[in-house]
Amino acid sequence: MDNEMTLTFLALSENEALARVAVTGFIAQLDPTIDELSEFKTVVSEAVSNAIIHGYEEDGKGVVTVHAKREDDVVTVSVMHKGIGIEDVSQAMEPLFTTKSVMERSGMGFTIMDSFSDQLTVMSKWREGTTVTFTKKFYTVRTAVM
């Protein structure tokens, strides 16, 4: 393992930016392209937002943990909460499915995460919590300094 980090915070909407910045800083060690950075930042944002919005019935009544691990040029991030969980993971991963339509949620979070990562895994137990894990290999080309 080359490096890893863990960040735990209250399930508050404003902490989504904290998680996004922390993970973006963590992967900056790989010298990613702007596109790679932007896509990965979007995946982190979607996963953390889902954990905050869908994981707990009240803001700040639980915690979200983000764990990132880098091995060579592959980064794996897990976003975990011990809140409500997902009753039907297959249904939740369908495009446009949302349990929060009154909040104008688009239901595209898992679709976006899946399209911007190399691998996406969702493990959930109803009323026990959810772990969303995504992996991305970075293909940056470094030039030698002479």
Curated annotation (Swiss-Prot):
Database matches in Pfam families: HATPase_c_2
InterPro entries, per the entry: Anti-sigma-factor_SerPK, Anti-sigma_F, HATPase_C_sf
Keywords linked to the UniProt accession? ATP-binding, Kinase, Nucleotide-binding, Serine/threonine-protein kinase, Sporulation, Transferase
EC number(s) stated in the UniProt entry for this protein = 2.7.11.1
Instruction: List the catalysed reactions.
Output: L-seryl-[protein] + ATP = O-phospho-L-seryl-[protein] + ADP + H(+); L-threonyl-[protein] + ATP = O-phospho-L-threonyl-[protein] + ADP + H(+)
Q: Which GO terms describe its molecular function?
A: ATP binding; protein serine kinase activity; protein serine/threonine kinase activity; sigma factor antagonist activity
The protein's enzyme class = transferase
* Swiss-Prot/TrEMBL GO biological process terms: asexual sporulation; negative regulation of sporulation resulting in formation of a cellular spore; sporulation resulting in formation of a cellular spore
Q: Which NCBIfam families match?
A: spIIAB (TIGR01925)
Task: Report the function annotation for this chain.
Answer: Binds to sigma F and blocks its ability to form an RNA polymerase holoenzyme (E-sigma F). Phosphorylates SpoIIAA on a serine residue. This phosphorylation may enable SpoIIAA to act as an anti-anti-sigma factor that counteracts SpoIIAB and thus releases sigma F from inhibition.
Please name the PANTHER family in this protein's record. Answer: ANTI-SIGMA-F FACTOR RSBW, ANTI-SIGMA-F FACTOR RSBW-RELATED
What's this protein's family per the entry?
Answer: Belongs to the anti-sigma-factor family.
The identity of this protein, by name, is: Anti-sigma F factor
